[in-house]
Amino acid sequence: MSQEFDYIIIGAGSAGNVLATRLTEDADVSVLLLEAGGPDYRFDFRTQMPAALAFPLQGRRYNWAYETDPEPYMNNRRMECGRGKGLGGSSLINGMCYIRGNALDFDGWAKEPGLEDWSYLDCLPYFRKAETRDIGPNDYHGGDGPVSVTTPKAGNNPLFHAMVEAGVQAGYPRTDDLNGYQQEGFGPMDRTVTPEGRRAATGRGYLDQARGRPNLTIVTHALSDRILFSGKRAIGVSYLVGNGDNPVTAHARREVLVCSGAIASPQLLQRSGVGPAALLRDLDIPVVHDLPGVGANLQDHLELYLQYACKQPVSIYPATKWWNQPAIGAQWLFLGKGLGASNQFEAGGFIRTREAFEWPNIQFHFLPVAINYNGSKGVQEHGFQAHMGSMRSPSRGRIHLKSRDPRQHPSILFNYMSHEQDWQEFRDGIRLTREIMNQPALDPYRGRELSPGVSVQSDAELDEFIRNHAETAFHPSCSCKMGSDDMAVVDGQGRVHGMEGLRVVDASIMPLIITGNLNATTIMMAEKIADRIRGRQPLPRSTAKYYVAGDAPVRGNPVRA
């Protein structure tokens, strides 16, 4: 069987759902949205309750659960690489931190030939267009967009306030909005949660607007096998439904839009014959277009947890016990309030570790419990932790297809920690985190250091801890980068170089990873490119002011050295 649409979107994630919603605002445009995962089950607390964020990472229903090849600089560990599966993509299983990146990230992109319109002031209107912030709009925030953003409220956990205060006492700036005028410093962290306390994935915020439109067709459990071409023009998609092996063909009159994420987008392009010719020939894949950058330039954020015992019973450790969870769940389900309605990442910060960095190179997430991101290895006592990670590692990895079978995962190698700068940043980061945690604001709460532990002090000891314990922050990106150099895959509008009717729109097209979590920026990029696809005028540039550190010192004098 075959069907025909104006546009076919492959992947209903943070970007694909934006494109599906915006393109079908034009009633004369037909769109097919293909998603390999299932629906956004609204009664499944695992994806709807913010505090349950660890659960989707533990199974396979919502998580592709990729693994890396042995990482050579990480004691050859095979490392987790979770990616979302289902309507919403990774916005269905992420930590819900609403962080956009630093203004200078985007100004850096705009210095690349062909990317001049990706400056911060060009991007800010699209961040605002996507957002509804619960305390109202301003120059930096939107008031009527599809993404619900919730700010921390008075009366939340005292550890959040103590950790921010400790950062300020350590000599770093205070900022009231990590997405506003000044990212650098410590302050409250916004989250993608609805006013009713539900996860604000793009399947909810965007697709709910568009589902009823007659010009949008959504097919779930549809695994795209390959893109179909006539010469250099993309003309359709062959996909498999459920566990079946009989391909279904859909044709695109205008364009095929690949929104499968930083792992699956290059994998799909390579499987379709677009990528490094030698790799494709090794797998007997006919080369449609030799494009060496497909799957190259892969980047991610790596992070560590620094954990402390808590002397007062104020952490959320009791909430990790099964006997307390029914009451928490009921309060969330019926009232949309309480511990269940928060992702518990309500404070954080960004700092520069050395004068050489023009903008922050380390991010902190503060958490009022001592536990792994995926819910494992919880410390069996009251505790708290800082997630600390470097933001713009010089290490580069790659995605290589291993098979023509669309159900087989690709070979993934990030080359984490492959540069001396990586080691320097993490050593600096651990030592500076300890200084922050040692400030007077945390005196009422801070018990012994649980991890790494006070015995871990020398460079060699820190390096061994990093090798064994650093984990992904789940931010793969840049594997189909925008630009005009020989390794660029797409131009500044997501159009694949050397091809017609084919775009990539997702985190894979970032030329360089940003300073912060990726979801908000991925949504912004899709909003921006949607206007290009529709032939609309770009939104007017913002005139908002933003902070540039310039000659400002990295930090002031700490209260306690």
UniProtKB/Swiss-Prot annotation:
<dbReference type="InterPro" id="IPR011533">
    <property type="entry name" value="BetA"/>
</dbReference>
<keyword id="KW-0560">Oxidoreductase</keyword>
<comment type="pathway">
    <text>Amine and polyamine biosynthesis; betaine biosynthesis via choline pathway; betaine aldehyde from choline (cytochrome c reductase route): step 1/1.</text>
</comment>
<dbReference type="InterPro" id="IPR012132">
    <property type="entry name" value="GMC_OxRdtase"/>
</dbReference>
<feature type="active site" description="Proton acceptor">
    <location>
        <position position="475"/>
    </location>
</feature>
<protein>
    <recommendedName>
        <fullName>Oxygen-dependent choline dehydrogenase</fullName>
        <ecNumber>1.1.99.1</ecNumber>
        <ecNumber>1.2.1.8</ecNumber>
    </recommendedName>
</protein>
<dbReference type="InterPro" id="IPR000172">
    <property type="entry name" value="GMC_OxRdtase_N"/>
</dbReference>
<dbReference type="Pfam" id="PF00732">
    <property type="entry name" value="GMC_oxred_N"/>
</dbReference>
<feature type="binding site">
    <location>
        <begin position="6"/>
        <end position="35"/>
    </location>
    <ligand>
        <name>FAD</name>
    </ligand>
</feature>
<dbReference type="GO" id="GO:0016020">
    <property type="term" value="C:membrane"/>
</dbReference>
<dbReference type="Pfam" id="PF05199">
    <property type="entry name" value="GMC_oxred_C"/>
</dbReference>
<dbReference type="InterPro" id="IPR007867">
    <property type="entry name" value="GMC_OxRtase_C"/>
</dbReference>
<dbReference type="GO" id="GO:0008802">
    <property type="term" value="F:betaine-aldehyde dehydrogenase (NAD+) activity"/>
</dbReference>
<dbReference type="GO" id="GO:0008812">
    <property type="term" value="F:choline dehydrogenase activity"/>
</dbReference>
<comment type="function">
    <text>Involved in the biosynthesis of the osmoprotectant glycine betaine. Catalyzes the oxidation of choline to betaine aldehyde and betaine aldehyde to glycine betaine at the same rate.</text>
</comment>
<keyword id="KW-0285">Flavoprotein</keyword>
<dbReference type="InterPro" id="IPR036188">
    <property type="entry name" value="FAD/NAD-bd_sf"/>
</dbReference>
<dbReference type="GO" id="GO:0019285">
    <property type="term" value="P:glycine betaine biosynthetic process from choline"/>
</dbReference>
<dbReference type="GO" id="GO:0050660">
    <property type="term" value="F:flavin adenine dinucleotide binding"/>
</dbReference>
<comment type="similarity">
    <text>Belongs to the GMC oxidoreductase family.</text>
</comment>
<keyword id="KW-0520">NAD</keyword>
<keyword id="KW-0274">FAD</keyword>
